[in-house]
Amino acid sequence: MEIAGKAVCVFLLLAIIKLRRSEGINRVSANLGHNTVMTCPTRTNISMVTWKINPKTGHQCTLAYRIDKDSTGKTNCSDRINWRSRPDWDQALEIQQVGKADEGNYTCEVVNADGNFHRLYHLTVIVAPRMALYCDDYGNPVCEAETEKSAAEISWVPESNSTPRADSHDNGTVTVVSWFAARSTNGKNPTCIVSHATLNETKSINCSSSYRDLILCIAIILSFLIIITFMAVIYYLKLHGCRFCHRSKPPDIIPTYSSQDDTVEVEPYTTYVQKENVIYNSVSDLTLRQNLPQGQSPAT
């Protein structure tokens, strides 16, 4: 019985291995911000393909395709993670603009009549170190270094009195910025030295000449604009302003009177005088008659 039990266990184990064939873990790396592609086992007469993604942080993501129904499914996957092409003839997975959150395990499962076949990946995202040395708007040398944690160390030759500033980002990188603030360079160009486990680089720069050139360029542009503006003002005054200067004074208006107006004004007065005389004469005649004795008539 014991031997029979062991035989059954071995048979079941072999059956499971046949149905679930998997390869060893494939370790892949991708640069931060770049695209990466992972492929599935090559098999014929595939009936179903499934990608199972287990990142270090976040939820599990699943991509599936069924051949018989020609349908795809997607669960908890970002738009950056998708099939590289049509899954009916290319089951590869593509991740666009890889980030630190994409690190983790990726498994492709292919199903056909012979069983289930798996290919496992472990993705590591590499942050390529970056160094930049430039001049700021005031003509001061600035040195930057972007690396994975921990932060890079920046030093200057000649020695600088400034304190570097470190900024941490969500993608797991750290950017260190340092300004050169030495009082004197003794005629030598400032040199930035970056030290890190993934980056050791040295660069020099001369900002004095570039800063003077910038100031000269700005001065020339401003002078040109001032001249153009001054000429435009003069032209405007010449074209419009002198019209107001040379305008002549309008002539004085002398009122005119017509003889007809005088006649109209005199006629009412003459009529009034005539009426007064008539009334006066009538009153005088009446008074004279009352004062005469009876039987006498006033002399005419």
From Swiss-Prot:
Residues annotated as transmembrane: 214-234
Extracellular side, ranges: 25-213
SUPFAM superfamilies in alphabetical order: Immunoglobulin (SSF48726)
Matches recorded under Pfam families: V-set (PF07686)
Tissue specificity annotation: Highly expressed in macrophages, peripheral blood lymphocytes (PBL) and peripheral blood mononuclear cells (PBMC). Weakly expressed in bursa, thymus, spleen, liver and brain.
Keywords: Disulfide bond, Glycoprotein, Immunoglobulin domain, Membrane, Phosphoprotein, Receptor, Repeat, Secreted, Signal, Transmembrane, Transmembrane helix
Superkingdom of source: Eukaryota
One record GO biological process: regulation of neuroinflammatory response
Residues with glycosylation annotation: 45, 76, 105, 171, 200, 206
One GO location term (cellular component): extracellular region
Signal peptide limits: 1-24
Disulphide-bonded residues: 40-108, 143-192
Glycoprotein listed as a keyword: yes
PANTHER family recorded: CELL SURFACE GLYCOPROTEIN CD200 RECEPTOR 2, CELL SURFACE GLYCOPROTEIN OX2 RECEPTOR PRECURSOR
Protein name: Cell surface glycoprotein CD200 receptor 1-A
Organism: Gallus gallus
